[in-house]
């Protein structure tokens, strides 16, 4: 009985040992598979880490490149800001120059207008003086004509002493109005009345052209004369001695 029981115990132990071996082999296989899986996972993680490190290096290089580009752009921006400030200063200077030129142009325009006004006034004054001188020349030519007529008139005999009275009156009628009458009537009316009176007298005794007395006569050239033509006779107004007419101070002054 003891031997049978011992054999049964040995068999049971052997069965237990084989079972444990099987369990151990299964456990070892599972452990090996787990180790392989973990190794694969470690390799994957290592690869991921390496990729991430490479990406981080690339990102750092890209960030450094971007930083250098940003610095270059900042320097360009500063240069453009300085150029813009310089352009603003230049524009301000040109605006000041333009305003100064406008002021000088306005001053020159005002000065030109004043000079134009002054010259226009002087031209008016000179025109008035020229008109006065023309009237004085006409008056002097009338006096000269009257004096020549008096010199060329035949001297009356002893019995006809009363005839020159109308001539004196006619000469007095030729005189321009007096200064107080001219001031009372105005420069337009007195000369108009005097011209009408002188025109009425000139109808009876015409007066020569005043231009003959205002401009010197040009002598004729000897070559222009024909040998058959008679020599030019002296005009009657140069026949006798002529008194030099006294030039009045104003056309309205009496003789």
Swiss-Prot record:
Residues 242-255 have a biased composition (Pro residues). Residues 166-177 have a biased composition (Basic residues). Disulfide bonds: none annotated. Pfam families: CCDC92 (PF14916). Residues 149-255 are annotated as: Disordered. It comes from the Eukaryota. InterPro entries: CCDC74A/CCDC74B/CCDC92 (IPR040370), CCDC92/74_N (IPR039496). Keywords: Coiled coil. Residues 28-90 form a coiled coil. This is Coiled-coil domain-containing 92B. It comes from Homo sapiens (Human). The lineage of its organism: Eukaryota, Metazoa, Chordata, Craniata, Vertebrata.
């Amino acid at each position: 009985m003891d031997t049978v029981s011992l054999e049964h115990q040995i068999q049971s132990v052997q069965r237990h040992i084989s079972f444990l071996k099987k369990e151990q082999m299964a456990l070892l296989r599972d452990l090996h598979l787990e180790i392989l899986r973990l190794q694969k996972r470690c390799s994957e993680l290592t690869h991921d880490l390496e990729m991430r490190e490479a990406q981080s290096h690339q990102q750092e290089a890209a960030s450094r490149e971007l930083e250098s580009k940003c610095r270059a752009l900042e320097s360009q921006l500063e240069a453009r800001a300085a150029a813009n400030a310089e352009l603003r200063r230049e524009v301000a200077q040109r605006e000041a120059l333009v305003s100064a030129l406008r002021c000088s142009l306005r001053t020159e325009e005002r000065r030109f207008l004043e000079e134009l006004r002054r010259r226009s006034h002087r031209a008016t004054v000179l025109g008035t003086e020229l008109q006065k001188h023309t009237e004085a020349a006409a008056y002097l030519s009338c006096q000269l004509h009257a004096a020549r007529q008096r010199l060329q008139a035949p001297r009356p005999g002893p019995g006809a002493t009363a005839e020159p009275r109308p001539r004196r009156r006619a000469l007095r009628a030729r005189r321009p109005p007096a200064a107080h009458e001219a001031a009372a009537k105005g420069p337009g009316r007195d000369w108009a009345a005097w011209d009408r009176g002188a025109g009425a007298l000139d109808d009876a005794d015409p007066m020569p052209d005043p231009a003959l007395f205002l401009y010197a006569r040009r002598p004729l050239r000897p070559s222009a004369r024909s040998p058959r033509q008679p020599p030019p006779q002296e005009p009657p107004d140069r026949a006798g001695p002529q008194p030099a007419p006294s030039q009045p101070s104003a056309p309205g002054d009496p003789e």
